[in-house]
Amino acid sequence: MTEWFLGLAFLLGIFKILNMSSLAVAPDIYIKDRSSAFVKSILAACPIFLEPYIPTLIWGKSGHIQTIVYGKMGRVQYPDLKGDRHEHIMSDGATSTFDVYHPLSEHQAGGDYSLLVCPGIANCSESPYIRTLVHMAQRGGYRVAVLNHLGALRDVELTSPRIFDYGSTQEFHHMVEDMRKIYPNSSFLAVGFSMGANIITKYLGEHPDHQKHFICGMSLCQGYDVIQVRPQLMSFFLPRLYVYAMTENIKKMLQRHRNILFSASAQEKYGSFNMEKIFSSTSLEALDEAYSCKRLGFKSLDDYYQSCSSGNYLNNVTIPMFILNALDDPLVPPCLHTIPREFAESRDNCLYVVTRHGGHLGYFEGGYFTPSPITWIDRAVLEFANAVVTMEEKQQ
């Protein structure tokens, strides 16, 4: 009898972890006016927002498993891509790079359209989830430019003693300007994932001129306010594990580029670093305090995080926006959803979409155990992009 109860408890525990009793439902959509021409046009062209998102049956309703699978695999399958690498030497000597992938067919609207993609933390054009989206967009007639965050490419040496940071828009800005010169007749759509979504949103809101080059922006799974999210991530066991994993990843990057990041000239420029503190850090807070704040000249973590957070710039954005979060994202808790929700409900041209499932950048769907190679988030990006392009074409 005891063994029976233990077996039942085990099965109930697995059932609870997998969240299998949760229903697959359509996303919640927050907008100002459902009867507006913009919203009606978008929803008519984007059935994905009105239909249930059905995660992979066995494990897809667990935000933690979605996030872990994304973190370990990126995507189930991803193509080998051939693109053109572009370099930009910045004023401090840093070499910013981005890769351009050309359309594999003509766009259905007949025009020239480019997705400008900013990946998540420590990611680049080689990241599996980026490659999956790029290939799908190419097949849909889009040119795709992907920013490589400083230090993220393993085979590219740094030429200046710095890596990326959460809120720097310099590299994205230079990619935009270079793309404008190379493809002056192309219409741009901004796409950002997680930290990259923070960067593109901040970039768009920093200066009104930045928005003139884009017909829309797409912010996917970002947290909006780093100061607000800090206590949430450090208060619970599993989020702390994710933070630890991200910290270890960045420490490996620092170690890989150690010779230039902590060279004599770097120490002369930024002051001496406490190497023991940096490489013994077990959280992003500790690492940022020991490294990022010192390199960037901030006196406190709050000052640094305040400067980085896109929520301070969001209200300046006036172009059409698609903003996405998942309720079960372990890195972006629902308490942060107030910022984009209030923004969307005050704008005529913004959709804030919140799914019940998806985790952090997971959004795997289809199948019982093995998901489809194409995720829900890939399909959502392309449907929204096509809808905005169609609206643009009608207005011309």
Question: Which residues fall in each region the model found?
Answer:
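Catalytic active-site module of serine/aspartate enzymes centered on a nucleophile-bearing elbow/loop
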Residues: 356-396
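Alpha/beta-hydrolase active-site loop
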Residues: 162-183, 202
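Active-site nucleophile elbow and catalytic-triad environment of alpha/beta-hydrolase enzymes
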Residues: 290-313
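Alpha/beta-hydrolase-fold enzymes
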Residues: 11-46, 181-296
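Conserved loop-alpha-helix segment in the C-terminal half of the alpha/beta-hydrolase fold
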Residues: 333-350
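Short, surface-exposed "cap/lid" segments of acyl-processing enzymes
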Residues: 101-158, 174, 178-181, 334-337
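Short beta-strand/loop motif that positions the catalytic acidic residue
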Residues: 317, 323-325, 329
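N-terminal cap/lid segment of alpha/beta-hydrolase-fold proteins
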Residues: 59-110, 172, 370
